[in-house]
Amino acid sequence: MPTSPWVTLAHIVRPQGRRGEVIAELLTDFPEKFAERRHVFLTRDAASDAAPREMELAGYRLAQNRVVLHFAGIDSIDAAEMLRGLDVVIPESERAPLDQDAAYISDLIGCDVWDEAAGQRVGIVQDVDRQASHVDLLVVDCENGQRAEIPFVKAFLVKLDTTGKRITMRLPEGLLEINASTATAREPRARRTRKRGLRKPITGADATPPDSQ
């Protein structure tokens, strides 16, 4: 799965007011990035070959989970309307370096999960659930057609290779069957394209998971 050299800070939803401002959905855990920058880039699709358009950031203000942006040269509602649906992105190279065993969520999406104990591929990471448990859960579409949720904990993690898109784990016997049943019983997740948002990194937790026997 090819990766984009860009990460997304926000997605422009619509014009805001009549002075050329736009309101955008935040896709970053680091909104202070807007205060640090004079320029950002706009694109319809960060994964495409088309070069994003560089824009001067004239102002911003936060509004709950959204941000109001004003770009230099965009001074009317008609001009702002032309920006509807665009993503606000920055180069991937501007992300902060990570500690060992930590990863940005966007880099985990699309990784193959391998079970070292069983010597086989489990499936591919489709999402990361940070809400349902005291540890982060890798949401994996398994080879057998089921969906499983695997705790991203150091007790299970053998090797994390986001460059090679591979996560090697040592999973307790029966864990996949139990967690696949739990995941299937929940409401189905909406299928959507995950943008490479600039999110806080997650680290394999130190917490020892409950005994799976």
Curated annotation (Swiss-Prot):
Its main location: cytoplasm. Residues 189-199 have a biased composition (Basic residues). It is found in: Cytoplasm. GO terms for molecular function: ribosome binding. SUPFAM superfamilies: PRC-barrel domain, Translation proteins. Belongs to the RimM family. An accessory protein needed during the final step in the assembly of 30S ribosomal subunit, possibly for assembly of the head region. Essential for efficient processing of 16S rRNA. May be needed both before and after RbfA during the maturation of 16S rRNA. It has affinity for free ribosomal 30S subunits but not for 70S ribosomes. This is Ribosome maturation factor RimM. It comes from Acidobacterium capsulatum (strain ATCC 51196 / DSM 11244 / BCRC 80197 / JCM 7670 / NBRC 15755 / NCIMB 13165 / 161).
